[in-house]
Amino acid sequence: MKHKVGILGGTFDPPHLAHLHMAEEAKKQLELEKILFLPNKIPPHKHISGMASINERVEMLQLMIEGIDSFEIDTRELMRTGKSYTYDTMRDMIIEQPDTDFYFIIGGDMVEYLPKWYHIDDLVKMVTFVGVNRPLYQPEVPYDVVKIDMPKTTISSTEIRNDIEHAEAFLPEKVWSYIKEHQLYGKK
């Protein structure tokens, strides 16, 4: 029997409670063995200024998943030079773990961008895409996407960075403490 592993990619700048809830809900609803958090360095679809460093983002992710045995961090995309594509990462993971079915978890807002992903026609044969439903957001795409429901959460890392003074309620306590201690995103 194949293993079932979920992958949640993103910049995680910063990682927040919606990321944690997405992972928990995907694991529960799809009966996944574990979730790999896949931080990326230069997402092909984003241009972000004021980012936390790679090390800071990984440290915040570690703080967020601390004590959850079925959650792990895979830093391979951070080691790549240039842009990092999901296709390349998944190709490598499938070679390394041929006995695993991968479930790539994306927010409802990313589903509509799937047709623009690098080698998407091959990628949809390699992984099962899992779209997390967001309130009032139900995009349709020409690919099979397993949809899971999640309690209402509409926060994003961008909104947190832009209003860090009011972000505490959306962050795990240890991540909030880390942001304050390291004065990230202008937090003093």
Curated annotation (Swiss-Prot):
SUPFAM superfamilies: Nucleotidylyl transferase
Catalytic function, reaction form: nicotinate beta-D-ribonucleotide + ATP + H(+) = deamido-NAD(+) + diphosphate
Matching CDD domains: NMNAT
Pathway: Cofactor biosynthesis; NAD(+) biosynthesis; deamido-NAD(+) from nicotinate D-ribonucleotide: step 1/1
InterPro entries per UniProt: Cyt_trans-like, NadD/NMNAT, Rossmann-like_a/b/a_fold
Alphabetized UniProt keyword annotations: ATP-binding, NAD, Nucleotide-binding, Nucleotidyltransferase, Pyridine nucleotide biosynthesis, Transferase
A molecular function (GO) term: nicotinate-nucleotide adenylyltransferase activity
Pfam families associated with the record: CTP_transf_like (PF01467)
Cross-referenced Gene3D superfamilies: HUPs
One Gene Ontology term from the biological process aspect of the record: NAD biosynthetic process
EC number: 2.7.7.18
Job description of the protein: Catalyzes the reversible adenylation of nicotinate mononucleotide (NaMN) to nicotinic acid adenine dinucleotide (NaAD).
Family according to the record: Belongs to the NadD family.
Protein name, UniProt field: Probable nicotinate-nucleotide adenylyltransferase
Species whose genome carries this gene: Listeria monocytogenes serovar 1/2a (strain ATCC BAA-679 / EGD-e)
